[in-house]
Amino acid sequence: NFLDCCQSFEIKPIIVLFDDCHYPFPQLGPQPLPIRGIHNSGWKQSPGHQIVTEIFELKTEKHLKRLQTYTQELLELYKEDERILMWDLYNEPGQFGIGEKSYTLLDYVWNWAHEIRPSQPLTSCLDGSIGDSIIALNQNKSDIITFHTYEAEKLEPTIEKLRTIGRPLMCTEYMAREYGTTFEFCLPIFKKYNIACYNWGLVAGRSQTNFNWETILYLNEERDKGNLVREGDSLTEPNQWFHDIFRQDGSPYSTDETAFIKKILSNKELQ
């Protein structure tokens, strides 16, 4: 259903299997309600730092068969599906303090994926990951070199550094308005270098990624107050959006911004 929905809007998703970012201890079943005004309050790590650490410490291999089955069955099922743009096997391995411990699982995941070898490209980001061995592994294994850059002053130097690798480049995370990586700033640079870019946020929904990262500091306080987003509740919004483009009613955060996006994508000369 998800892929059909994406196809109906001419969107090709990048499918992410594992992730070291945000909150640990993921569990199956009903999930906690989002916390109002907090960036991405429900996002969970996959499979979670506890399991990643156990795999690193070789305390148990009970998780490996399950994770291998998850990885390979998914890739096998959709390996020829043209609705999928790419597989991002592991988002930002090493993030949120776990560091090089993620290397062990990451290496397993790359090997599992190459046993299936889907038709779509495989990747895991360089800039955005933590740890020299992790970054080196991703650079060696990725069909397309992907990177994450939110700070305006780092975007062009990052591209200059990574283009020497000699493989196609795609920026799969960018656009934090308060850090200067607006569409008006980033898209001309991507166009200059012929770099692909993928905007992960579209509509400001219950994940509330239009609020900035600093709001995470108030997560426990707001949760204790019971300040939750329930089904059918209207959503508040900050004066300056961090990420995302549209409201749920389809109106843009900035009409000037969406006009600029349309203009640069139409290949008309920028003013």
Regions found by a protein language model. Give the residues of each.
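Active-site mouth of glycoside hydrolases
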Residues: 1-144, 148-149, 153-156, 164-165, ...
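Aromatic- and carboxylate-lined catalytic core of secreted/periplasmic carbohydrate-active enzymes
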Residues: 193-271
